[in-house]
Regions:
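Structured loop/turn residues at beta-strand edges in well-structured enzyme cores
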Residues: 20, 67, 104
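Residue-level signal for short amphipathic helical patches enriched in basic/charged
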Residues: 33, 67, 75
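Short polybasic/polar patches that bind polyanions
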Residues: 48, 65, 88
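Conserved G/P- and acidic residue-centered "switch" motifs that form tight phosphate/ATP-binding loops
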Residues: 51, 68
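C-terminal "cap" of GNAT-fold acetyltransferases
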Residues: 70-114
Length: 114
């Protein structure tokens, strides 16, 4: 896929069961050296609560480490409690806003990839 998700610095991971797409997550680089972003994590409603989001998060973190990134950032809506708890279990912590975003009620998070 072209654009910011293009390899070698960007990645897209998709989860399938019986050829049905059930989830995915993307990894674009940020301008800051060694920093990437987790974007577009989604799990289809039927498959939520079954570890798909956790598996995709683990895989994208490992992928980012393999590419050589030292930090990963993300943004999420503050109302998405389940997603925020998931990110916290992996070690993400809240940071200041890191890009210009017109949306309100957004939480920004970061993790060191060591």
């Amino acid at each position: 896929m072209p654009g910011k998700y293009a390899e070698p610095d960007g990645k897209i991971l998709l989860a399938f069961i019986n050829n049905d797409l059930i989830g995915g997550v993307a990894l674009p680089p940020l301008e800051e050296e060694g920093v990437c972003e987790m974007k577009r994590l989604f799990v289809r409603e039927k498959w939520r609560g079954q570890g798909v989001g956790r598996s995709l998060t683990k895989q994208i973190l490992n992928t980012a480490k393999g590419v050589g990134y030292s930090k990963m950032r993300l943004d999420t809506e503050k109302r998405l409690d389940i997603a925020i708890k998931l990110y916290q279990t992996f070690g993400f912590s809240e940071i200041d806003q890191y890009y210009d975003n017109p949306l309100e009620d957004i939480l920004y998070m970061e993790i060191e990839l060591t």
